[in-house]
């Protein structure tokens, strides 16, 4: 009987440590920074690399880390009761042509799906909703604006009774467009649909991981929760066999202390 093959380590052939690669991808995707901004910030912390290395790592590992985050979150969301989705589309210019970025957000601000199309017709809306329903299951209510493509698509899918429309009813998803707009300006817009689709999916996963609903929790709860999310982001992807798991246990032990930069300091120290 053949022995089961272990999954290949994606960090092989890279001289930099996995901790640094995770930190670089997290900084570029999470914050509205350019490639050279990330290069300068890392240089101030003793990590010397080129901005093109940031581009390479983001393209290579961004989708991998995003898939890891999505895999951990999707299974937990399927059992939600009274689940409401908010659907909306935003215009994004690619090489002078307008494209539509369809986005689905639930009532708690979790970005569920992102989908790029050239049109806003019934076929585009149907493809977007099929993709979201296949991955996340069916919600209790679906809130949309007055675009007739949604109604036609829901008639075809047989869930028109779940649709809700109304003034200000879709503010949840419209407000969630703002981080994407800020990131679009930092990247000097997009040049291909494929790039926009990839970035929208990766950005949504990282946004969900770090979204703590800051306006709903007090400062102390926020401080205790923030290092744990950072530690989780720095463990994305398969861990190399040479990595000491006790090192991450030491980090978790210190999470309850008011030392919020502990993990980043250990990452930088590991590269010194």
Predicted segments — roles?
Residues 1-29, 33, 46-51, 55-56, ...:
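Basic, short loop/linker segments at the boundary and entry of helix-turn-helix/winged-helix-like folds
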Residues 24, 38, 54, 88, ...:
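Mobile genetic element proteins and their domesticated derivatives, centered on retroelements
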Residues 32, 95-111, 121, 129-132:
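Short conserved beta-strand segments at catalytic cores or DNA/RNA-binding microdomains
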Residues 56-77:
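Short, basic alpha-helical nucleic acid-contact segments in DNA-binding proteins
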Residues 60, 114-135:
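Active-site beta-loop-alpha junctions of metal-dependent nucleic acid enzymes
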Residues 73-97:
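Intrinsically disordered, low-complexity basic tails/linkers immediately adjacent to helix-turn-helix/homeobox/MYB/SANT
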Residues 146-205, 211-212, 217:
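Helix-centered, glycine/charged polyanion-binding patches within enzymatic domains
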Residues 186, 197-262, 269-272:
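C-terminal domain-tail junction helix/linker
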């Amino acid at each position: 009987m053949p022995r089961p093959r272990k999954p290949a380590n994606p960090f092989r052939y890279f001289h930099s440590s996995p901790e640094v690669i995770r930190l670089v991808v997290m900084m570029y995707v999470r914050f509205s920074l350019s490639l050279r901004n990330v290069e300068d910030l890392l240089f101030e912390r003793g990590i010397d690399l080129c901005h093109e290395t940031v581009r390479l790592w983001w393209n290579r590992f961004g989708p991998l880390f995003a898939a890891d985050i999505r895999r951990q979150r999707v299974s937990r969301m399927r059992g939600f009761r009274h689940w409401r989705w908010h659907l909306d589309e935003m215009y994004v210019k690619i090489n002078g042509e307008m494209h539509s970025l369809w986005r689905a957000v639930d009532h708690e601000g979790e970005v569920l799906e992102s989908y790029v199309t050239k049109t806003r017709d019934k076929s585009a809306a149907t493809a977007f909703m099929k993709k979201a329903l296949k991955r996340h299951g069916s919600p209790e209510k679906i809130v949309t604006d007055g675009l007739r493509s949604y109604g036609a698509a829901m008639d075809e899918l047989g869930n028109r009774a779940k649709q809700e429309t109304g003034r200000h009813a879709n503010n949840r998803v419209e407000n969630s467009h703002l981080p994407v707009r800020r990131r679009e300006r930092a990247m000097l817009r997009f040049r291909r649909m494929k790039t926009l689709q990839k970035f929208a999916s990766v950005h949504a996963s990282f946004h969900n991981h770090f979204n703590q609903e800051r306006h709903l929790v007090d400062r102390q709860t926020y401080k205790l929760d923030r290092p744990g999310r950072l530690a989780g982001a720095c463990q994305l992807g398969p861990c190399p066999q040479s990595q000491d798991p006790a090192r991450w246990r030491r980090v978790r032990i210190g999470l309850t202390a008011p030392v919020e930069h502990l993990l980043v300091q250990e990452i930088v120290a590991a590269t010194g």
